[in-house]
Amino acid sequence: MDDFERKPELSPTAATLWTESGADPIGDLKLWRDLYEDENGTTPGAMVVSREIVTALANAPQFQVTMAGGGSRPATEADVQAILMANGLPPMTVFTRRTYSGPVLPKDRVLLLPPAVDTDDWSGTALGSTFWGQTLTAEDPAWGIAPLDRPGIVLGAYRNPKPPMIAEIISDAIGLPVLEDPNLSLVAKVL
């Protein structure tokens, strides 16, 4: 796995994994939040987790909800979010995207990142951006694409005017993700 020259201390492992007895998820997250702030001069603005991590947090004693009569129940996702925010931690986003080869992000890691930006914000964040190039297809006058709209994905449909009446869909794009500051990401193993 390539770390893109991120400082090793920004890839910690919880002293006690969060599914084990005696784990301190809130303490771990506060420690990592402070480490992130010491490194970057700002606190993280987002926390990205898997569904498995939400389940581990919901079942942790620190997150259990005490019921009338002394019983308790595991926290809901909303309870977990509220407890994290009450402890000065960034909002949690559950990321479950998969590809044919498996999850996009490891299920056992918490990511602390800068705040999310709008997907149309071309400048991205200090962490990085994705830049769209302009293809030759986009420059073809037959498409009628305005110059400002040419960078990005070009998609079109053609239909053969003579038999066989076949429709053809074509697409073309140039995209380049650019990582500007890998130290704006902290990736901690917790499960």
What role is predicted for each listed range?
Residues 15-20, 69-191:
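Sequence/fold signature of self-assembling virion shell proteins
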Residues 2-87, 91:
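Extended, solvent-exposed, turn-rich assembly/linker loops in the middle of proteins
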